[in-house]
Amino acid sequence: RFLKGKGLFRLLSDTIAPMLKSKPSRLRVTEDFRLFFPDYNNMEISLNLLPKVVYFLFLRHPEGIFIKNLSLYRHELTQIYRLLSHRDNLEDMNESIRKLTDPSDNSIYEKCSRIKRVFLQKMSDDLAQHYYVDGYPRQPKRILLSTGMISFPDALKNIKTVISREDYAVMNLAEIFKNMGIEEK
């Protein structure tokens, strides 16, 4: 009654009802790099700059990324950061990217944890698990959402990678075999 009296019942039911179906929504990244879920009443997820940079990197790599190999993605992270940031302080940007790609620094884990927390604040884990960065130990970390359910602006799609997607996939496979004790001969 309270919610109806305040006119909030309809708003809440329109937002929550689609999420109760436990079916992942499409994810739309706008031209100004905001994140929306069209199938959840256009619910928006807000991330701070560095977690958003990390999130977009993982969205661009559905094959997954081994955290220990993150330095291979430094150029791409820098390009995403420049695209999202309106600051010209290259020193700060380079230091942030250095920390993200340093295996001895926890920065990447902190950013992934923040991403997960933001999604869990907005939806149940059975839905959120499709959207946050996750993975088993000794496996590449990735976002589970199918690439067919993600729409990007061209500016984000057109960022050049230093290494081809195929080479990343081969490196990931080699790392998985190595972790299983299968060495190349």
Can you say where each PLM-predicted feature lies in the sequence?
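Short, flexible helical or helix-coil boundary motifs
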Residues: T15-M19, L84-E91, D126, M180, ...
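DNA-binding patch around the recognition helix
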Residues: S13-P24, V29, Y109-Y168
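Short glycine-rich, low-complexity/disordered patches
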Residues: I65-E76, E91-I97, Y109-E110, Q121-Y136, ...
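DNA-recognition element of transcription regulators
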Residues: L47-V54, T101-K122
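Polybasic (Lys/Arg-rich)
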Residues: I159-K185
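Short boundary/linker motifs that mark transitions into or out of structured domains
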Residues: L3-F56, H61, N158
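Short interface patches used for recognition in eukaryotic signaling and trafficking proteins
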Residues: F37-N41, E95-T101
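Short amphipathic alpha-helical recognition elements used for nucleic-acid or partner binding
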Residues: M43-E95, I115
